[in-house]
């Protein structure tokens, strides 16, 4: 049985990307698309959804790094 090549769409431009070791930027098609995605995460345009409250904003929660 011959190996089937798996292809995935680039998350940024939707170009088809072969899922092989030689695809350096997978799942992205290029360094450009990889950096665009990184920029979106850094600018907080993307986020992982969560049902929990943001504990970092709770003044009653200590991280142990407060200066006294």
UniProtKB/Swiss-Prot annotation:
Organism of origin: Haemophilus influenzae (strain 86-028NP)
Record-given protein name: DNA gyrase inhibitor YacG
Residues that coordinate or bind Zn(2+): 10, 13, 29, 33
Function: Inhibits all the catalytic activities of DNA gyrase by preventing its interaction with DNA. Acts by binding directly to the C-terminal domain of GyrB, which probably disrupts DNA binding by the gyrase.
Listed PANTHER family: DNA GYRASE INHIBITOR YACG
Gene Ontology biological process: regulation of DNA-templated transcription
Gene: yacG
Subunit structure: Interacts with GyrB.
One function term, GO molecular function aspect: DNA topoisomerase type II (double strand cut, ATP-hydrolyzing) inhibitor activity
Domain of life according to the entry: Bacteria
Cofactor(s) it depends on: Zn(2+)
Protein family according to the UniProt entry: Belongs to the DNA gyrase inhibitor YacG family.
Regions annotated as coiled coil: none
Record key words, sorted: Metal-binding, Zinc
Note accompanying the cofactor annotation: Binds 1 zinc ion.
InterPro entries found in the cross-reference section: DNA_gyrase_inhibitor_YacG (IPR005584), Znf_NHR/GATA (IPR013088)
């Amino acid at each position: 049985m011959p190996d089937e090549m798996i292809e995935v769409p680039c998350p940024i431009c939707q170009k088809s990307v072969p899922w092989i070791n030689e695809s350096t930027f997978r799942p992205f098609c290029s360094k450009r698309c990889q950096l665009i995605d990184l920029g979106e995460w850094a600018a907080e345009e993307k986020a992982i959804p969560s049902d929990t409250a943001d504990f970092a904003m709770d003044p009653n929660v200590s991280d142990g790094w407060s200066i006294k």
